[in-house]
Amino acid sequence: MAKGKIVQVIGPVVDIEFPAEELPSILNAITIKGKSGDIDINLTVEVMQHLGDGITRCIAMSSTDGLTRGMEAVDTGSPIKVPVGEETLGRVFNVLGQTVDHNPAPVGNKEFWPIHRPAPKFDEQETSTQILETGIKVVDLIAPYSRGGKIGLFGGAGVGKTVLIMELIHNIATQHGGYSVFSGVGERTREGNDLWSEMTESGVINKTALVYGQMNEPPGARMRVALTGLTMAEYFRDVQHQDVLLFIDNIFRFIQAGSEVSALLGRMPSAVGYQPTLTTDVGALQERITSTKKGSITSVQAVYVPADDLTDPGPAATFTHLDATTVLSRQIAELGIYPAVDPLDSTSRILDPHVIGEDHYEVARGVQAVLQKYKELQDIIAILGMEELSDADKLTVARARKIQRFLSQPFFVAEQFTGSPGKYVPLKETIRGFKEILEGKYDDLPESAFYMVGSIDEAVEAAKKIKQEA
């Protein structure tokens, strides 16, 4: 293993000189161990540039406090390697694959994979498009997820992103037997801790590996932590032939960290100060998330949109890769309808009769048409009241309100808060329920019967109870 010495430290950027014939490759991990006063230093840096004269410019994965010129650095001969396999489940890791949950390190972990890996070749990829059933009515009906697809999750603070993420993890684990990997990229440490606590309480932690690189970490760690999580997910896909869920919260912070690193390396910025390699960086990550003939990685990515500007180069680079968008709406959350998914704003590439079938497509578009009409009538209702509407419009409003309530659903992971047992609704049942509402089969039932139930049969039962109590 080649040894070099530090010649310059500027914040998270470390320049290391190696013998010219032993220069480490780009993306290799280099370890620096030593003591500086009372501080024990154990730092990993990643090679980013060769400056000539045997000097490599590296980016640190943790704090560079205490580093001095002349300290010894050792080339590991490979990129950062992280543990993979079932031993990672139920644990919290950092970007280097070290456990940070204060429990003993995983015992018997045999395999370590490098975080920089090629994307699957064309001939390895699955060509057919299949729907991934989530058991969440509004998602399966309006904006269905494709197996091995990429989904953007948009929503402000407090509208239920985390609960939706945990429900997806729960349903994939129980119904598909699949594992999940959660990459926390550049978000609040408190949120990461809350997620871990909630997962532990709801019991989904044993099917999940958590990888965190929070906003207090140097940009190198935030830029690479998504790749650490992705590598763990790739093992479950390629070796265990699983259908894996990969959550990235937040994909924008990955781009932001890349832009910080780019500036630190002295590259000329492009539009709005982003790195010139923006589309390459995003593409290198997204192309590895796909279905192969062995298994699939379906990715749900929370997308922060700076200043709500969808044309910003950061989010715009992400949108080109997404197959579906799930938009959470504060207005719907205020009505008490959870999950607060906006059925008119959420989209999916596979909402196409050739992929999901004519029946599903017709029902989904029918539901959207009724809700859109209701939205248009709301101003009239607010000013003139329901009495001024025509009979046809009154019927549309009544059905729309039933549909709106029927899009709500009790979640398994929220059982201890709501007191209602969670419901997994198969896709066939979801389509049947909404189809029958659109056909007018339940026009005589009270709309409250449709709120927070699973299948349509439960709504009918709830209506009977309401009638008896009245």
Curated annotation (Swiss-Prot):
Pfam families in alphabetical order: ATP-synt_ab, ATP-synt_ab_N, ATP-synt_VA_C
Gene3D superfamilies reported for this sequence: 2.40.10.170, Bovine Mitochondrial F1-atpase, Atp Synthase Beta Chain, Chain D, domain 3 (1.10.1140.10), P-loop containing nucleotide triphosphate hydrolases (3.40.50.300)
Catalytic activity annotation: ATP + H2O + 4 H(+)(in) = ADP + phosphate + 5 H(+)(out)
GO molecular function: ATP binding; ATP hydrolysis activity; proton-transporting ATP synthase activity, rotational mechanism
Membrane topology reported for the UniProt record: Peripheral membrane protein
GO CC terms of this entry: plasma membrane; proton-transporting ATP synthase complex
Keywords: ATP synthesis, ATP-binding, Cell membrane, CF(1), Hydrogen ion transport, Ion transport, Membrane, Nucleotide-binding, Translocase, Transport
Compartments, as annotated in UniProt: Cell membrane
SUPFAM superfamilies cross-referenced by the UniProt entry: C-terminal domain of alpha and beta subunits of F1 ATP synthase, N-terminal domain of alpha and beta subunits of F1 ATP synthase, P-loop containing nucleoside triphosphate hydrolases
Residues reported to bind ATP: 155-162
E.C. designation(s): 7.1.2.2
Entries under HAMAP family matching the protein: ATP_synth_beta_bact
Family: Belongs to the ATPase alpha/beta chains family.
Subunit (UniProt): F-type ATPases have 2 components, CF(1) - the catalytic core - and CF(0) - the membrane proton channel. CF(1) has five subunits: alpha(3), beta(3), gamma(1), delta(1), epsilon(1). CF(0) has three main subunits: a(1), b(2) and c(9-12). The alpha and beta chains form an alternating ring which encloses part of the gamma chain. CF(1) is attached to CF(0) by a central stalk formed by the gamma and epsilon chains, while a peripheral stalk is formed by the delta and b chains.
Function as written in the Swiss-Prot or TrEMBL entry: Produces ATP from ADP in the presence of a proton gradient across the membrane. The catalytic sites are hosted primarily by the beta subunits.
Protein name: ATP synthase subunit beta
Organism the protein comes from: Pectinatus frisingensis
Lineage: Bacteria, Bacillati, Bacillota, Negativicutes, Selenomonadales
